[in-house]
UniProtKB/Swiss-Prot annotation:
Belongs to the TRAFAC class translation factor GTPase superfamily. Classic translation factor GTPase family. EF-G/EF-2 subfamily. Its main location: cytoplasm. Residues 8-282 form the tr-type G domain. It comes from the Bacteria. Keywords: Cytoplasm, Elongation factor, GTP-binding, Nucleotide-binding, Protein biosynthesis. Transmembrane segments: none annotated. Catalyzes the GTP-dependent ribosomal translocation step during translation elongation. During this step, the ribosome changes from the pre-translocational (PRE) to the post-translocational (POST) state as the newly formed A-site-bound peptidyl-tRNA and P-site-bound deacylated tRNA move to the P and E sites, respectively. Catalyzes the coordinated movement of the two tRNA molecules, the mRNA and conformational changes in the ribosome. GO terms for biological process: ribosome disassembly. One of its GO terms (cellular component) is cytoplasm. The keyword Cytoplasm applies. It comes from Bacillus cereus (strain AH187). InterPro entries: EFG_II (IPR041095), EFG_III (IPR009022), EFG_III/V (IPR035647), EFG_IV (IPR047872), EFG_V (IPR035649), EFG_V-like (IPR000640), EFTu-like_2 (IPR004161), G_TR_CS (IPR031157). This is Elongation factor G.
Amino acid sequence: MAREFSLENTRNIGIMAHIDAGKTTATERILYYTGRIHKIGETHEGASQMDWMEQEQERGITITSAATTAQWKGHRVNIIDTPGHVDFTVEVERSLRVLDGAVAVLDAQSGVEPQTETVWRQATTYGVPRIVFVNKMDKIGADFLYSVGTIHDRLQANAHPIQLPIGAEDEFNGIIDLVEECAYMYGNDLGTDIQRVEIPEEHKELAEEYRGKLIEAVAELDEEMMMKYLEGEEITVEELKAGIRKATTSVEFFPVICGSAFKNKGVQILLDAVIDYLPSPLDVPAIKGTLPDTDEEVERKSSDEEPFSALAFKIMTDPYVGKLTFFRVYSGVLNSGSYVKNSTKGKRERVGRILQMHANSREEISTVYAGDIAAAVGLKDTTTGDTLCDEKSLVILESMEFPEPVISVAIEPKSKADQDKMGTALSKLSEEDPTFRAHTDQETGQTIIAGMGELHLDIIVDRMRREFKVEANVGAPQVAYRETFRSAAKVEGKFARQSGGRGQFGHVWIEFEPNEEGKGFEFENKIVGGVVPREYIPAVGAGLEDALKNGVLAGYPVVDIKAALVDGSYHDVDSSEMAFKIAASMALKAAVSKCNPVILEPMMKVEVVIPEEYMGDIMGDVTSRRGRVEGMEARGNAQVVRAMVPLSEMFGYATSLRSNTQGRGTFSMVFDHYEEVPKSVSEEIIKKNKGE
């Protein structure tokens, strides 16, 4: 089967936003206008095509990024719908990694919100070009230019409107196209009666002002256009389009457009903008990777002629076909039934069937080409972030990094039958989601699950019940505290046991010191002259790593410290790896009195939106939760409070906010960093963990 769409005519885009900005509705409308859906599903009726897991339809939020393919004006557009809820940032992170461009959806009333900032930061990390779609122009309080202002203020992004709305709220009935200097008027809310007309007289002055600003902004990034502009020459529509495209694909400029997906206004123009301004796989830099044996850097160009290489970015369990591996092809061609190498794991895999997905329906295809996104059936060992490549031309593409979980709960099956199924369910779910972990607590024997927030774990438990028929009781949430050292010291660990026959002997001197935040544990061997034989050195490192997992103060993992083995002694007969492991853990215990250990807690960036009259109560409440208020501003007729609050103080906040504001307040939070716990709180945590 020959390639249906050329690489130039392929777009791989993501749709990203804060929860409730109308992202899934926008995707739905795109699928509707590109002919993939016959009846539109409304999110608030629980009928959306992209949200196909039961919980997504119930909660009206998107949890897993469904990958869908659509066609528009001779182009193939592969769309990944990403979740806007903060607990699912891993989904956003994975999809951004494999996209060439993205549409950031904003709510016209709120502009940039906290999760928008998080997602925007992730997109910047991966160098993803973006268009901004200011949605919900029909909503009360919609303000396009305010929203554009928030992009400058909060994201420090070089964003400029390439459209202006005609009217707002109930009066929103048209869009001015600043590039083509025309307007589109909507005769109804069905998107069927659209007329291209001249810009209405009363809007001409504003349109001219903003077109001038647009040309100036684009010319600043394009020398040729700048010369023409300065010499007062006319800049043609084609030149302006080419300038916007070049500046957008190089991530120096972000075009802003507007509309109301729900009212079917602006969606076709959004699709045109995706084609006009977002890059094809040929416009983005060739993907870099390394050779498995030598770590030498190589690149793979977007071409069917190059050897096959792809990145697995999502694993899903499908009730009918089993495990689905979603992957993005960067180079070469793959046929179903062929063998590939998983170079990350060094395993050979057979690709059974290849499916192209449309939300929750699928079409079987025999071949995928460079630039395509598809799902494979039959890959046994592949997990998120693995590279798949041609067996004769190995490469490891740069993988993704996922944050550590910040919250955990104990979970126990309700019956013996549930217990057997729970193990399978948890291993499948953690295979799908790298930020979800499950382990058994050695001391209590309880199963502990950990994730990125309360909603994340709620949904995991929910999926266990629905998909795997496992009924379980869930304990109270626990915060993932960490421990670290604040000062350096040299300490001794000596383990000697003599009880007839062969004894045990290990003796070490270790220098501990704080490490930079986020650097983790680093072990260094500074032994000279063989006072500790070389074969026992790894045992010292391993002994420390094991001991660090169980903490020194309250049983939480110790992070961000350096340990150097500087001296020690051994016994010809009695020394063993085990003895040195134990000596190392004894040294860590001895460090407690000298290295000033402290407990660290996860801090959350919180944004609360409330009516003005509740401002005092909310500020007091945030402070009582050990929060630091970092900023306030008016947004329409509401007030926004931004604060940094410890996660441990945020449990049950939704209920408290509801009662404090008669249900009129909303909040969102995202993990930010770890910070030292105050002494009084630290003592409480230690007491609680010792069962006092």
